[in-house]
Amino acid sequence: MASLRIAPLALFFFLAASVMFTVEKTEAGIPCGESCVFIPCITAAIGCSCKSKVCYRNHVIAAEAKTMDDHHLLCQSHEDCITKGTGNFCAPFPDQDIKYGWCFRAESEGFLLKDHLKMSITN
């Protein structure tokens, strides 16, 4: 009798897992999975950003952009990132069809080199 009660629950979990893994493999326009109305994207660590109050993958945002002003992290050169104040490095996507890059900060190596050079001059 207990197995009859558990069977519908097991079927529900199986169907939910099937849908979840099917959606995870498609990257086109599917959002990363959460809304960013009140809080930022939780999935930012795996490459998601907020656009129109929904979290999308970064390469999807860049591929669908008509201009650089569609998202604050889109760029075509390092100067664009510095001008917008969103970083100092414009990284292009591996896909050649995407004409915009993504801004991020890349300062740690520069600071280490600058500190090393300063140390070697004073000694």
UniProtKB/Swiss-Prot annotation:
It comes from the Eukaryota. Residues 1-28 form the signal peptide. InterPro entries: Albumin_I_a (IPR032000), Cyclotide (IPR005535), Cyclotide_bracelet_CS (IPR012323), Cyclotide_sf (IPR036146). Contains 3 disulfide bonds. Expressed in flower, stem, shoot, root, leaf, seed, pod and nodule (at protein level). Keywords: Antibiotic, Antimicrobial, Cytolysis, Disulfide bond, Hemolysis, Knottin, Plant defense, Signal. Disulfide bonds join 32-48, 36-50, 41-55. Transmembrane segments: none annotated. Residues 59-123 form a propeptide. The presence of a 'disulfide through disulfide knot' structurally defines this protein as a knottin. This is Cliotide T4. It comes from Clitoria ternatea (Butterfly pea).
